[in-house]
Amino acid sequence: MIVPQSAPPSPVRLFSATVILLAATFMDGRLPADEPAQGTPTASANATAPAPTTVDEATIAAAQPICGNWYITSSTPPLYLYRDAGRMVDLFSWHQRDSNKDGIPNLRLSHDSTHLNIESQGYPNHPTAIFPNSGNPNSIAVQNFRFRLPLQPERSDVITRLPMGPIGMALNGVVFFNPFEQGGMNAVAGYSEVWLDSCCGHPQQTGVYHYHKYPACVKSPFRDDGRQHSPVIGFSFDGFPIYGPWEAAGVMAKDAGDHSALDLCNGHADPERGYHYHVTPGRFPYVLGGYRGVVERSNLRQRGTLSEGAIEDNSSGESRLPKVITEILPGTAVRGQKHQLTVKLNPLKATRAPLPEGAPDWVQIGPFEAESIERSGNDVRISVSIPPDAPAGVLLDCHIEFSTAGRRQVFKLNDAFRVTVEDE
């Protein structure tokens, strides 16, 4: 008889402000969600926190226009509101909170006559993997980004090629990178695929945590369940908004045809929103394919002349990442409920290092943390609570972590699990 092995307690993911201010990075690498200041975090704490919402009528009536779709209130501190298809939304207040407990808000906003000015710590306010690990040798560090977004973005006559480094920013202040790894190959698919955690991010050499593809862990103003157009999840450095994957009820933007088809930059225009971009899960270029607008050069690391033209997919071959996780059963779950799931493992695929004995000490599917973890043979049984506002209809990644004597062992399965709406 195989006796189920329970996982050891999850690592404490909170650190004192002294450590953060002096080191600007965390010794165990995992970044905390918005959780209590002491003790081991409770499961899914960030996933169940309320997301930003529409603004009440009184606040809207008192807001003053700045430029384009941007408005500001006279409150202290002021709210920056964005007009999204006729709705006024507060995109940033929820993400401005001091989630790393260093006394500095994640985001600080101001504006001038032409730009929204954003100071960002580049700090993800959702659960991440512990870095460094067997899939990535780098640590996550707090940043001091300063970005300028055009308040009234303008279309360009040419497509500007995406540089390396940050190309845009999610609502939480974490940056998007283009889909290529340092050597110039596709980082998301094929032989050159790199290890991303289940929130689709990882740190590079200087500690910048960033996304290469759709980060379902970023809170957006409205539920993104495939029943309507997706909400805004970030902005490109030309000032145009980046939306989630859905174009309309049951239709992903990547599958839209005729006049709604996405261009080479992953963007299109409609009467309500004007020109905007969409993320395209599972399809290159995943976030942006180029800048269709006039890019704000001060945001870019690259100096000098920028090239023209959209980027092209250069993926080839099969991924070299060990496919230790074979599947999750069942592969779907409805929102607003707690579920018992089984993560199936194949130890023969652990070619870089043997699969550790015992239960993993961390399992995460998209933004959802396992509340309990047990292992019986090659089956890892977990319980996961899916919050009512979870993103639905999009395949989520799963990663697991083992605490070992050396570097933490991590394994990943892409497109492993899907949240469904209640009546599917």
Question: What is the predicted role of each segment?
Answer:
Residues 39-190:
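Solvent-exposed N-terminal domain segments of exported/luminal and surface proteins
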Residues 1-11:
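N-terminal secretory signal peptides that target proteins for export/translocation
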Residues 189-194, 206-254:
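Short helix-loop boundary/capping segments
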Residues 316-360, 407-424:
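Beta-strand/beta-sandwich contexts
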Residues 259-321:
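Long, compositionally biased interface segments
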Residues 385-392:
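Short, surface-exposed loop/turn segments at beta-strand-coil junctions that are enriched for proline
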